[in-house]
């Protein structure tokens, strides 16, 4: 018996006929069988199953067939196939339903009919008790079916597949996710469809983002289709990142595809598979990218993609661009370059003009002006690279290149000649008349450099017009004040410092908060201060030395005694010699007192002396009126204290200025002082130089004009000013300077200010000692040609110091010093040669004057001529400043004496000058006496030897002429006339006989030597 099947598997038949012996013949694959074959197979099957087959004499009924259960199963399958192609009633478009039905039918047919490569073709039933021969019937059926269906083929070779264990696969996943997270890479999860994910930074942390459809311009109801395995893999990858809670308000444009794990967002939101993928927001609620929404919601909701950001930027940009487009363009605008290149050029210009990390970053908006206006080399280098990029890669944008070039040129317009601006302020800063005010205004405008505006240029042009009209109209008026009515009391009220009254700059204890200023103040502490270790004691810091002397600090009082008597002794301090108020204590301009630049007095006009200033630790003490203010220093080490280096105590003034500087300007302020101001000032500068530095800082940082200064003590004996720090002063009796703010200190800058104190050093050299030593050196070198030559080579202007005494000038003229100077300086340095000629002419006139008063008047007449030659000095050295100081004093003394004489007053300074001349002459005569003594000794030794030779060579009795010559020579040599007792030894032998003495007694060698020694 044989049976043909369309989709029946051989295994089913094997189960049915499990106990029988079968012979199976492979047949063709039924996947490609057509409908006719299937129909014929069905009819054959039904004929076998429903009709009894007669084999010989016996009938075989349906119940007797061994494959009756198989018939029932095949019948049900055939019934299903019969109705397989029928169309179901569905809603929707006809064409779409038809296409879907055809596709589904093909899939189900292929799934139904596709079986294994072999089916049962022939079944052999062994003989039973009923001997039935079914061979013929089965062969007929098989022959009819195999003509179309039988196709023999070799069975496929099964390939063995190797599978990784679950633990190894997990390790591979873990390593892959670690690499993706560290390198911010893109990962693709592939199943039936691929899902892409990327890693990027979001709100300060690294997060996982999935690629969704709306990011590529597609608006679908389901933004991300993902199967379960991909969701599990994506969740496993998301677990590698920190599960931080995300603020709902921070989810905006650019957060599309953000994968949030359950717990990182509010519990009220919907999750699936333990995570939430951001799509956008609809009616204030976030939408998951995997959720299915309606078409209306899909097109009305706000998607949080980066493309939305670009649209939000470009659409307003395009709208405003068209709105501001200029009228009257002479040509028709066409697209000549691509929009992409225009965007690239716009990005280059943005980074060149306003460098930032994001155009929406507010912090970049605040810091960018400082970067653009600054002069950092990194900023200029970056802008130069961008300009080179424009030239090389974008030559079709010449307007962008020209714009950036002009910007860099404008930025490089910086005025570096600070000395000229300061000199202008020193020369005419105190004059309030035209044209001096115009010159000062032009100087300040030019100092601005690249910060100039159009209004500044117009103002400068106006001032230059006024200068051109009034440049030659210079006048100077000076009046002498009287100290009898001078009063300069200090205020008992404390100065109001706005910087210390702002609550934002004070802590909970009311102390000043340095902020960024304290961080940048380290440039002062490290470079110009010395650390004090309290563990080592304070003894070595008590004596504060300077070149002129020393004073004692009160730092030793930090170690206090519990004995009240000892404490009372410490309060008294150690006083110096106290000086009264004099001209050295005042400052005048245009005949009026400049009170801030004068010493403080009491109500009766007497000087107010300093008392003991108590020490403190780690403080900056400011304020001169009322109670001082104590600010905590921004120390580097809480256990250390700091004291200014010797010669740099003026750094406490700059520390006080830093209090009023803005925090954003503190870095430039401290660097400018460290790199520019301090190298110019050096150690122990003059007060005028310190005031000039403060004036320069006030131009760049106007807030420092209101800054309070530390206390300043004046030591008139040593011509020194002491800027006090927190360690006070144990030495008392100094005068006190009244100035309290920076604007008052700047008054010392003006050259028209008449004050001795502006030349005082904030620490420094003793100028009086230096001047006296230079004069002594000049006197010593008059009769030492080698020493004079060395002085003329190293310090040529030292010869001007000779005008302090007419005797020194005459001695230098007689010794040939001026002639030696002329030979040395001609023709290379005509200025010095002219100066030597002037001094030589003055010395010639002094030799003709008999009276000392006449000699002084001649020197005063030549003082102005000498000063004019000194102003144009070609060498800068120490002797030049000393010479200018002495000549200036001569001129000032002459003018004051003249004013007194015109007023009817008697001038008593002549006696002082006579006494000074006698003092100098004593030293000069002592030097000359030593020189004469040496000359006499050398002369006497020479004549002694000559006379001894003559006494032996000639006979005095026979050679009378030679005797007379001998006596004449001795008389001239020893300057002793023969008629005197000293000349008795020179008389003739005849004279000695009359006196009763023999010639041997007179002219023996021994007696002659004694007489010669007596004459010497």
UniProtKB/Swiss-Prot annotation:
Keywords: Host cell junction, Host-virus interaction, Hydrolase, Inhibition of host innate immune response by virus, Protease, Serine protease, Suppressor of RNA silencing, Transport, Viral immunoevasion, Viral movement protein. Changing residue 755 to T: No effect on proteolytic activity of HC-pro. Changing residue 632 to E: No effect on proteolytic activity of HC-pro. Its EC number is 3.4.21.-, 3.4.22.45. Residues 997-1007 have a biased composition (Basic and acidic residues). It comes from Tobacco etch virus (TEV). This is P3N-PIPO polyprotein. It comes from the Viruses. Potyviral RNA is expressed as two polyproteins which undergo post-translational proteolytic processing. Genome polyprotein is processed by NIa-pro, P1 and HC-pro proteinases resulting in the production of at least ten individual proteins. P3N-PIPO is cleaved by P1 and HC-pro proteinases resulting in the production of three individual proteins. The P1 proteinase and the HC-pro cleave only their respective C-termini autocatalytically. The record marks 304-305, 763-764 as: Cleavage. A motif (Involved in interaction with stylet and aphid transmission) lies at residues 358-361. Changing residue 698 to T: No effect on proteolytic activity of HC-pro. It is an enzyme of class 3 (hydrolase). Changing residue 729 to T: No effect on proteolytic activity of HC-pro. The keyword Zinc does not apply. The N-terminus of helper component proteinase is involved in interaction with stylets. The central part is involved in interaction with virions and the C-terminus is involved in cell-to cell movement of the virus. The active site is at 214 (for p1 proteinase activity), 223 (for p1 proteinase activity), 256 (for p1 proteinase activity), 649 (for helper component proteinase activity), 722 (for helper component proteinase activity). Changing residue 743 to T: No effect on proteolytic activity of HC-pro. The lineage of its organism: Viruses, Riboviria, Orthornavirae, Pisuviricota, Stelpaviricetes. Residues 641-763 form the Peptidase C6 domain. Residues 163-304 form the Peptidase S30 domain. Changing residue 358 to E: Complete loss of interaction with stylet and aphid transmission; no effect on virion binding. Pfam families: Peptidase_C6, Peptidase_S30, Potyvirid-P3. Belongs to the potyviridae P3N-PIPO polyprotein family. GO terms for biological process: proteolysis; symbiont-mediated suppression of host innate immune response; transport of virus in host, cell to cell; viral translational frameshifting. GO terms for cellular component: host cell plasmodesma. A motif (Involved in virions binding and aphid transmission) lies at residues 615-617. The keyword Protease applies.
């Amino acid at each position: 018996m044989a049976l043909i099947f369309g989709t029946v598997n051989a295994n089913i038949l094997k189960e049915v006929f499990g106990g029988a012996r079968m012979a199976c013949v492979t047949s063709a694959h039924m996947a490609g069988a057509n409908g006719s074959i299937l129909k014929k197979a069905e009819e054959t099957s039904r004929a076998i199953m429903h009709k009894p087959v007669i084999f010989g004499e016996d009938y075989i009924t349906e119940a007797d067939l061994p494959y009756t259960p198989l018939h029932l199963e095949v019948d049900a399958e055939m019934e299903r196939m019969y109705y397989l192609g029928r169309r179901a009633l569905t809603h929707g478009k006809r064409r779409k339903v038809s296409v879907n039905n055809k596709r589904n039918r093909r899939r189900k047919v292929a799934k139904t009919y596709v079986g294994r490569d072999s089916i049962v073709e022939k079944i052999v039933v062994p003989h039973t008790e009923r001997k039935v021969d079914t061979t013929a019937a089965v062969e007929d059926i098989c022959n009819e079916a195999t003509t179309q269906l039988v196709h023999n083929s070799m069975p496929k070779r099964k390939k063995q597949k190797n599978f990784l264990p679950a633990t190894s696969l997990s390790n591979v996943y873990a390593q892959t996710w670690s690499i993706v997270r560290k390198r911010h890479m893109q990962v693709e999860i592939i199943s039936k469809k691929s899902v892409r994910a990327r890693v990027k930074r979001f709100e300060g942390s690294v997060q996982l983002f999935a690629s969704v459809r709306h990011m590529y311009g597609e608006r679908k109801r389901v933004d991300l289709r993902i199967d379960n395995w991909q969701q599990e893999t994506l969740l496993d990858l998301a677990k590698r990142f920190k599960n931080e809670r995300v603020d709902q308000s921070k989810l905006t444009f650019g957060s599309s595809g953000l994968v949030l794990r359950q717990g990182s967002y509010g519990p009220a939101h919907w999750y699936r598979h333990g995570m939430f993928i951001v799509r956008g927001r609809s009616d204030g609620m976030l939408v998951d990218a995997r959720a299915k929404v309606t078409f209306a919601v899909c097109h009305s909701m706000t998607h949080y993609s980066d493309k939305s950001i670009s649209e939000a930027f470009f659409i307003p940009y395009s709208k405003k661009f068209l709105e501001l487009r200029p009228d009257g363009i002479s040509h028709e605008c066409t697209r000549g370059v691509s929009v992409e290149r225009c965007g690239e050029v716009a990005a280059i210009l943005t980074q060149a003009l306003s460098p930032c990390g994001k155009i929406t970053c507010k912090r970049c908006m605040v810091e960018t002006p400082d970067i653009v206006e600054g002069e950092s080399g990194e900023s200029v280098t970056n802008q130069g690279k961008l300009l080179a990029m424009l030239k090389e890669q974008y030559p079709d944008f010449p307007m962008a290149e020209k714009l950036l070039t002009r910007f860099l040129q404008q930025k490089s317009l910086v005025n570096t000649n600070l000395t000229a601006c300061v000199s202008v302020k020193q020369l005419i800063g105190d004059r309030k008349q035209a044209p001096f005010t115009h010159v000062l205004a032009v100087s300040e405008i030019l100092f601005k450099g690249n910060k100039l505006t159009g209004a500044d240029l117009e103002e400068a042009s106006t001032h230059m017009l006024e200068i051109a009209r009034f440049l030659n109209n210079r006048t100077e008026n000076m009046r002498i004040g009287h100290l009898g009515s001078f009063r300069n009391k200090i205020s008992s009220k404390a100065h109001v410092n706005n910087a210390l009254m702002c609550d934002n700059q004070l802590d909970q204890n009311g102390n000043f908060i340095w902020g960024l200023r304290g961080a940048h103040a380290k440039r002062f502490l490290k470079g110009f201060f010395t650390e004090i270790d309290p563990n080592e004691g304070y003894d070595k810091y008590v004596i504060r030395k300077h070149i002129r002397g020393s004073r004692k600090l009160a730092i030793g009082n930090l170690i206090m005694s519990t004995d009240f008597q000892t404490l009372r002794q410490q309060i008294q301090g150690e006083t110096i010699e106290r000086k009264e108020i004099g001209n050295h204590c005042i400052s005048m301009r245009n005949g009026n007192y400049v009170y801030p630049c004068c010493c403080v007095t009491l109500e009766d006009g007497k000087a107010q002396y300093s008392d003991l200033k108590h020490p403190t630790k780690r403080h900056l003490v400011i304020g001169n009126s009322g109670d001082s203010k104590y600010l905590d220093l921004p120390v580097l080490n809480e256990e250390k204290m700091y004291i200014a280096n010797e010669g740099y105590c003026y750094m406490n003034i700059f520390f006080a200025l830093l209090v009023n500087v803005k925090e954003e300007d503190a870095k430039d302020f401290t660097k400018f002082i460290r790199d520019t101001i301090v190298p110019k000032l050096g150690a122990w500068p003059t007060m005028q130089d310190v005031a000039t530095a403060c004036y320069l800082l006030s131009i760049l940082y106007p807030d420092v004009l209101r800054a309070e200064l530390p206390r300043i003590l004046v030591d008139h004996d040593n011509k020194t000013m002491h800027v006090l720090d927190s360690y006070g002063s144990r030495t008392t009796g100094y005068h006190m300077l009244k100035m309290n703010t920076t604007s008052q200190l700047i008054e010392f800058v003006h050259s028209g200010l008449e004050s001795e104190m502006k030349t005082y050093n904030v620490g420094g050299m003793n100028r009086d000692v230096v001047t006296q030593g230079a004069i002594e050196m000049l006197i010593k070198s008059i009769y030492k040609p080698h020493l004079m030559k060395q002085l003329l080579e190293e310090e040529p202007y030292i010869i001007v110091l000779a005008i302090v005494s007419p005797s020194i000038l005459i001695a230098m003229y007689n010794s040939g010093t001026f002639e030696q100077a002329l030979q040395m300086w001609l023709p290379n340095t005509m200025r010095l040669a002219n100066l030597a000629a002037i001094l030589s002419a003055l010395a010639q006139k002094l030799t003709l004057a008999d009276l000392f008063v006449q000699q002084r008047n001649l020197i005063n007449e030549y003082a102005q001529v000498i000063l004019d030659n000194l102003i144009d000095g070609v060498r800068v050295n120490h002797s030049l400043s000393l010479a200018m100081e002495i000549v200036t004093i001569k001129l000032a003394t002459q003018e004051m004496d003249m004013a007194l004489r015109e007023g009817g007053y008697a001038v008593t300074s002549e006696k002082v000058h006579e006494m000074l001349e006698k003092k100098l002459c004593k030293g000069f005569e002592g030097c000359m006496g030593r020189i004469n003594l040496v000359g006499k000794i050398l002369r006497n030794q020479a004549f002694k030897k000559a006379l001894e030779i003559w006494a032996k060579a000639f006979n005095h009795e026979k050679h009378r002429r030679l005797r007379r010559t001998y006596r004449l020579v001795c008389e001239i040599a020893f300057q002793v006339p023969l008629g005197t007792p000293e000349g008795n030894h020179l008389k003739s032998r005849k004279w000695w006989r009359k006196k009763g003495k023999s010639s041997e007694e007179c002219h023996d060698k021994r007696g002659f030597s004694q007489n010669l020694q007596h004459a010497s």
